[in-house]
Amino acid sequence: MKLGIVGLPNVGKSTLFNAITNAGAESANYPFCTIEPNVGMVAVPDERLDKLAEMYQPKKKTPAVVEFVDIAGLVKGASQGAGLGNKFLENIRRTDAIVHVVRCFDDENIMHVVADASTNVPVDPLGDIETIDLELIMADLEIARRRAEKAAKLAKSGDKKFLHEAEVFQRLSAHLDAGKSARTFDAGEDAELINGAELLSLKPIIYAANLDEDGFANQEGNKYLQQVAELAAREGAQVLPICAKLEQDIAELEGEEKQMFLEELGIAESGLDRLIKCSYSLLGLISFLTYGEDECRAWTIRKGTKAPQAAGKIHSDIERGFIRAEVIAYDDMIKYGSVNAAKEKGQLRSEGKEYVVQDGDMIYFRFNV
């Protein structure tokens, strides 16, 4: 899974990236301090995998990973190449989802890059969101218009498929031209057609509302957070309150020291853990587990994935030669204390090609090639 972290300059984007990846990207109070995308691979926290590793003491423990990409800041006009716009748009196109960092706290010492320099607004999360959204929408509008024109030309041959495609992209063009994102377009039965266009404003989005420590402790009283939450609810997006500077402090701690610090703050889990969970939920992802003395490993798949395709995540030969999946639910294994005890209680299931893998399934694949 690849998540692109975006945001206007000076909203805390690189600070958050540094905190969650410990990648040390330069963070400075001026635009474009992140010129090339910084990439950080982060292990997905999974207590189930930790427990299996504790039980089996394998040679290797391999968690699922999330790739975070800190994408260069942009300004108004990016879709026309202003600022670092072209780089921004190309880099974001390669991601599975967008984490849009928006500043939700006042600080007169932080320079705010506004879309219109004549408007002296110190903090304007909705305006910041609109600035980036419009650049994505304008880039998509160019694509939609080209698709409509191409389909219209091909439709002259009398092919009804292209006539329909031209109509769909003409409707989409009008929708985008009105300043609305592709996410809010009613594609109906044409969703697959629209998805194939790889539109930027169609990507799932998480608004990371960056708060200062006071705002994080008193979220209900933060008017900026409430504005972002209301927008996210209307769009069907996710909102994640986070304090980037606090996350930096948390990232420097480990083990019991980290847990004690979180407890002192009254936080159950770090912002990174919450962001990963939010991302999994947004993208409809789950994990299954493989286990043994050589390796215990978590694998990420989409909800609804059938057993052979899940096996293909491990190796294409296993998918090609799939015979069956021997499955134990993790919760059943914990309930009975071990895999062998769960087997004795009849909890080992033999599943075929149509089995839909569930979150937390512990699987051994039988195959022959």
Give the ranges of each region predicted by the language model:
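Short, conserved glycine- and acidic-residue-centered signature motifs
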Residues: 81, 137, 221
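Substrate-engagement module of ASCE P-loop NTPases
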Residues: 94, 135, 140, 230-235
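Conserved G1/Walker A P-loop phosphate-binding module
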Residues: 1-120, 126, 133, 144, ...
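C-terminal-of-GTPase-core extension/linker across diverse P-loop GTPases
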Residues: 2-6, 11, 17, 145, ...
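Amphipathic alpha-helical coiled-coil segments with heptad-repeat character
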Residues: 85, 122, 129, 134, ...
